[in-house]
């Protein structure tokens, strides 16, 4: 992995929104640990969230087109909320905060500019991507609390495998402390990113979502500076020594989702 200094990014770096949100200053914002609460529908009789798992590898452009159409339908009230679990062929995506210098090998894999928040990330086989299309008007119109809830969903999923995932206030996503690795130059403990978050809101309906590394080829991250952070690495469940399958992770994701966001409906 590349080494260097962590660039300072705004607290909303993983978010792109077309909704009327006015973030307060950093000193006024509570920490995301304090923000987390169950992100449930306000109506007791709200329909469950549709839960779909795609087979095989999903073309990225097809996924974008599907999300755009589904978000529109959700806004219009003709489609329910949806979580869509996919895997992609190897590719890089650039969020709205991406720095061109962080794309180290542009010819390695296809590169897609996307409207989600965040910087460069990698998607590929062995990584579970969950596209989250929820109507925050039915829940809470609170972007930072929503991000904290997405992080909690990941943290509870990892806990099912006895992995302690952690938040970092200056870095959206979920991190794992690696005490077995050499300490950083400043003496702090090594930390690796195991899950990324990048979302977009369109009139309070979310899309894009989260990505958890199950067993991807971690060397593929070498073509970018992941999320603009060069002093920390990336890891996966299998890299941490867990012989888990994608199916195992999907089961854990489903249970943790219901804990944080409420009922879901599978087909």
From Swiss-Prot:
The active site is at 227 (acyl-thioester intermediate). It holds the Pfam family LplA-B_cat. Pathway: Protein modification; protein lipoylation via endogenous pathway; protein N(6)-(lipoyl)lysine from octanoyl-[acyl-carrier-protein]: step 1/2. Keywords: Acyltransferase, Cytoplasm, Transferase. The keyword Nuclease does not apply. This is Octanoyltransferase. One of its GO terms (molecular function) is lipoyl(octanoyl) transferase activity. Substrate binds at residues 116-123, 196-198, 209-211. One of its GO terms (cellular component) is cytoplasm. In the reaction, the free carboxyl group of octanoic acid is attached via an amide linkage to the epsilon-amino group of a specific lysine residue of lipoyl domains of lipoate-dependent enzymes. Residues 1-30 are annotated as: Disordered. Residues 77-265 form the BPL/LPL catalytic domain. InterPro entries: aa-tRNA-synth_II/BPL/LPL, BPL_LPL_catalytic, Octanoyltransferase, Octanoyltransferase_CS.
């Amino acid at each position: 992995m590349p080494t260097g200094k962590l660039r300072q990014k705004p607290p909303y770096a993983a978010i792109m929104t077309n909704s009327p949100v006015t973030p307060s200053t950093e000193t006024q914002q509570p920490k995301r640990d304090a923000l987390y609460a169950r992100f449930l529908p306000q109506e007791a009789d709200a329909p469950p969230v549709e839960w779909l798992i795609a087979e095989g590898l999903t073309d990225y452009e097809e996924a974008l087109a599907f999300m755009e159409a589904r978000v529109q339908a959700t806004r219009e009230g003709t489609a329910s909320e949806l979580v869509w679990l996919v895997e992609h062929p190897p590719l890089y995506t650039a969020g709205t905060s991406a720095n061109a210098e962080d794309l180290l090998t542009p010819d390695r894999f296809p590169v897609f500019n996307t409207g989600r928040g965040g910087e460069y990330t990698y998607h590929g086989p062995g990584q579970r991507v969950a596209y989250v299309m929820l109507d925050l008007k039915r829940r809470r119109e609170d972007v930072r609390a929503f991000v904290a809830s997405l992080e909690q969903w990941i943290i509870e999923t990892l806990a099912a495998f006895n992995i302690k995932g952690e938040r970092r206030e200056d870095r959206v996503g979920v991190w794992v402390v690696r005490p077995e690795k050499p300490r950083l130059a400043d003496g702090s403990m090594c930390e690796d990113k195991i899950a990324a978050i990048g979302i977009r809101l369109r009139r309070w309906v979310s899309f894009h979502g989260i990505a958890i590394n199950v067993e991807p080829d971690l060397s593929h991250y070498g073509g970018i500076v992941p999320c603009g952070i060069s002093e920390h690495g990336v890891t996966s469940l299998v890299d941490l020594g867990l012989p888990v399958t994608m199916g195992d992770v999907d089961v854990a994701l489903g249970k943790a989702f219901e804990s944080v966001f409420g009922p879901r409906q599978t087909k």
